[in-house]
Amino acid sequence: MASAVVSMVPTTASRFALLQVDSSSDSDSEKARGAHATGKARSGSAAKGKSKGNEKKKEKRRKKKEQQQSEANELRNLAFKKIPSKPSQGIGGALQEHSTHNVPKEYQEDDWQQWQQRDEQLTSDMFEADLEKALMLSKLEYEESKDNGNEVNGVPQSKKVNKKDKRRNNQGKDKPLTVPLKDFQLEDQQAKKQEELKSPAMPQDRGFFNKLEEDVTKIILKEKRKEHSSDVTESFSTPDYSMEPALKDGKTEVLKQEIEKKEAELKQMKSIISQWEAKYREVKARNSQLLKMLQEGEMKDKAEILLQVDELLSIKNELTLQVTTLHAALEQERSKVKVLQAEQVKYQGGKKSKKNPESEHGR
């Protein structure tokens, strides 16, 4: 299972691929032997140059060993969550820069390719190991949760890991030996696993298991209640069930009496409801009749009013005609009066003219 998952996941170079560190002193000895063999092939005139070159190589080896030890200590401190001291960091950086300047480019490229291959192999191997460990831990936790409830596995493993870490720390303090990258990666991953185990994720798992247990108990109780209710209904539905022992009790008799009283009350209520329904129907019929009468009365009143309006309009028309005739007669009379008045004035003027000459003649 783990190998299949690893084949699906692409492996990449780890963060340790950037470190230019040799695997052990054996590679250095092999390089020195090769350099020494090539030095022997040279002429005898360059013997002094060879001795100087050997001294330089020895110094380089010593510097490389010191660099490896400093980097190993730094990686140990990082794995066990320790802050490295500032002077050691400065010395390691200076040594690394000096070594990178002194090492030729061909060796650096070869070392770089070798380290890349090793890192890829290490990452794939470590990924497989982590998957296997995770699967085993999950299985163990599941089995222990079934058996013991909420116990968690992982405490003895952490103790073993701590013992191994202490031994490795003591070895690093006592012996100035180089440590391979596998051990550092293992220690780092084990420390991370310890932190994950110590993290407050387990109470949540416990709460989850407790909830599961509560849900299971609730479901079981519901099923039991359903079974009990089904058994009771079946016992009541069977003809073998007799009410004789229940009738003997006083409670059943009291209940029967109460039921009879309630039935009588229900009958009375039903009769009252039927009476009220009949009354409601009568009132409804009366209301319908009243509505019809009111509608008819309103129509009659409207018809009478319209007739009266017609009569009044006819009277109005007659009166207007009379007024017009009277007005014409009045104007005629006025014209006659005016004519008579004019004639009267003339008549009076003629009489006066006749009287005046007669008076003058008498004088």
Curated annotation (Swiss-Prot):
<feature type="coiled-coil region">
    <location>
        <begin position="328"/>
        <end position="348"/>
    </location>
</feature>
<dbReference type="GO" id="GO:0007165">
    <property type="term" value="P:signal transduction"/>
</dbReference>
<comment type="similarity">
    <text>Belongs to the GKAP1 family.</text>
</comment>
<dbReference type="GO" id="GO:0005794">
    <property type="term" value="C:Golgi apparatus"/>
</dbReference>
<keyword id="KW-0175">Coiled coil</keyword>
<feature type="coiled-coil region">
    <location>
        <begin position="247"/>
        <end position="298"/>
    </location>
</feature>
<feature type="region of interest" description="Disordered">
    <location>
        <begin position="22"/>
        <end position="124"/>
    </location>
</feature>
<feature type="coiled-coil region">
    <location>
        <begin position="54"/>
        <end position="79"/>
    </location>
</feature>
<feature type="compositionally biased region" description="Basic residues">
    <location>
        <begin position="160"/>
        <end position="170"/>
    </location>
</feature>
<feature type="compositionally biased region" description="Basic and acidic residues">
    <location>
        <begin position="98"/>
        <end position="107"/>
    </location>
</feature>
<feature type="region of interest" description="Disordered">
    <location>
        <begin position="143"/>
        <end position="185"/>
    </location>
</feature>
<keyword id="KW-0333">Golgi apparatus</keyword>
<protein>
    <recommendedName>
        <fullName>G kinase-anchoring protein 1</fullName>
    </recommendedName>
</protein>
<comment type="function">
    <text>May play a role in the regulation of insulin-dependent IRS1 tyrosine phosphorylation in adipocytes.</text>
</comment>
<dbReference type="InterPro" id="IPR026109">
    <property type="entry name" value="GKAP1"/>
</dbReference>
